[in-house]
C-alpha cells in the first residue's frame, strides 16, 4: 500500500465522526485527496507523506488550494513525517500565491503512543473549527 493510502486509512480510522470521501485526482487535476463533512462544515485535505520537511505540491494542487482559500473555502495540507512520526497540518492560506509556500504548520501532533487519541481529536477540531485566515487585500496573480 502506498504511503498516502496508509495516511488516508489512518484519517478514516481515527476521525470516524466525519463523513470522508476519497477523491480521484485524475478526474480533476489539483483537487485535494479527501473531502469531509460534519454537521454542515466541509473540508478538503491534501495528504502528503515525506521524510523531509518539504511539502511537494504540484502547480495544479497549489493553484486549487490557493483559489479555494481565496473563495472562503476550508482546505488543508496534512503532512505525515515518517521519521519523526508527526502530523503537520497547514491551512491552505500558507499559499500566499499559487507558487509560494511559507509558514510553519499551525498544528503539529505526534500520532503514536498513549496520546494518539487526543492528537487525532485535535486534528479533527483544527480541520473543522479553526478560524480561517483573512484573505489578502490584493491577492497576487
Please give the residue ranges for each predicted region:
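Conserved catalytic cores of phosphodiester-cleaving nucleases, focusing on short active-site segments
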Residues: 34-36, 41-51
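Nucleic-acid nuclease catalytic cores
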Residues: 69-95
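Charged phosphate-binding loop/patch that engages nucleotide di/tri-phosphates or the phosphate backbone
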Residues: 106-141
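Sequence/structural signature of beta-propeller domains
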Residues: 55-56, 92-99
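Beta-rich catalytic cores
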Residues: 30
